Structure formats: structure tokens, C-alpha cells
């Protein structure tokens, strides 16, 4: 789980606006996804995670905090990115050893705002 201080810095640096489409790649238990969903209820939050235990906690946290603007996408990031809406913001919390390929893929994705922020 990402520490609270780190989540605060992430939220500050992302400069989220209503209508944002946020990808949390390697979402883990969803602490960053939940923070974004709570801070910007008008944003679409897409949490990508492949570990079964983390997915269970991610789903539990989504229900616990009633995060209706957060979707969970099980699987490895490189296999699910094409099914997601184009992002305005991306946070890479984990890459499963595929960071180089993931970053290469992210640079080829059309971005709604014309600017893609990748924070990791």
C-alpha cells in the first residue's frame, strides 16, 4: 500500500480535473486509485492489477468506500490497456518487470488532453 504522504504528493502532482481518465497500472490494493476516485469524483479511474490477492482487496476497498467511478481491470497491463479509454493521467505503481515495454506502449497511446503524465 502506498503511504498517505506519497498519495498526497501524487494527487498534488497529477492536477486532476473533472473529466479526467486516470489509469493506475499495478494498482495493488487500490490506495492510489481510491485516493484519486475520492479526490475527483468526476474522474474515471481504471485500476489494473494481476495479483489475485490484491484484486480481492481492490474490490473490497472499492465497495467499502463506494467508489462508483473506479473500474477494476484484472490482468497484466500490456494485455488490458487496449480495452481502456484513452487516459489523461497514468500512474505506474508496478509493472511486473515489464516497465520498458509498458513505457514504450504508453508513448504510443492517443491522449485526450494531448499531454500524458506518467508518474512512477
Task: For every predicted segment, state its role.
Residues 103-115:
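A short glycine-rich, Lys/Arg-flanked "PGG" loop and its adjoining helix->strand segment in the class I
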Residues 19-28:
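Conserved class I S-adenosyl-L-methionine
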Residues 29-41:
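Conserved SAM-binding loop of SAM-dependent methyltransferases across substrates and taxa
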Residues 38-45, 109:
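Conserved S-adenosyl-L-methionine
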Residues 3-18:
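Conserved alpha-helix/loop element of class I SAM-dependent methyltransferases that forms part
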Residues 86-94, 101, 115:
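Short SAM/SAH-binding signature in class I
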Residues 48-89:
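S-adenosyl-L-methionine
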Residues 49-54, 94-95, 120:
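Short beta->alpha hinge that forms the Motif I/post-I loop of the SAM-binding pocket
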